Structures are given as structure tokens and as C-alpha cells.
């Protein structure tokens, strides 16, 4: 397994909405993550700094990267654009952390 860690941001006024939308995530998104080899995916909110710290274990970078091209991921990203900064393709602005 490959362990990944990354940070994202959440809008200061959107903490509760962000948490509501993730509790739970869409079942079809969860299924896509699992079918693409993602395990133990967890996201933690740092309210004081409006940061999200995420960890995930993946089976391969190729399968993990393929999640982004799925319809459900594209819809999820669009759904989240009003609560967190997004790139032009609606993916969340994120920075990968090095271990």
C-alpha cells in the first residue's frame, strides 16, 4: 500500500456545511474509491486554520488518479465548489505532503 497525505482548504463560513455533506459521502463515491483501491480514507478539519488534513492508503497511483475522471467524482467536486476553494476543473485546491 502507498500512504498519501494532503491538505485542502474549506471556506471559513462553511465548516458545518462541509461536515454535513460528508456525513455520509455519497454511496456511489465511496464505491468508486473502493473499486479504485483507496482504503482508510480520512479527512480531519482544523477549524482554527480552515484546513482539511487528509490521509488515504492506495493500491497504485494510476488507480488513484483514475478516480478523478469518473462521473461521480466530477459531480462531487462540482457539489463541493461552494464550500471549498477549487481549481478551474472543480477539483479541490490541494497540496500533497511528503513523509
Swiss-Prot record:
One of its GO terms (molecular function) is L-rhamnose mutarotase activity. The active site is at 22 (proton donor). Its EC number is 5.1.3.32. It holds the Pfam family rhaM. Homodimer. Transmembrane segments: none annotated. Involved in the anomeric conversion of L-rhamnose. Belongs to the rhamnose mutarotase family. GO terms for cellular component: cytoplasm. It is found in: Cytoplasm. This is L-rhamnose mutarotase. Its main location: cytoplasm. The keyword Transmembrane does not apply. Substrate binds at residues 18, 41, 76-77.
Amino acid at each position: 500500500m502507498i500512504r498519501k497525505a494532503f491538505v485542502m482548504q474549506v471556506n471559513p463560513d462553511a465548516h458545518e456545511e462541509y461536515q454535513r455533506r460528508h456525513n455520509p459521502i455519497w454511496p456511489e463515491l465511496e464505491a468508486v474509491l473502493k473499486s479504485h483501491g483507496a482504503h482508510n480514507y480520512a479527512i480531519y478539519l482544523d477549524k482554527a486554520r480552515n484546513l482539511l488534513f487528509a490521509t488515504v492508503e492506495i493500491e497504485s497511483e494510476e488507480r488513484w488518479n483514475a478516480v478523478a475522471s469518473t462521473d461521480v467524482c466530477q459531480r462531487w467536486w462540482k457539489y463541493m465548489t461552494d464550500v471549498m476553494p477549487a481549481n478551474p476543473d472543480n477539483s479541490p485546491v490541494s497540496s500533497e505532503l511528503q513523509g
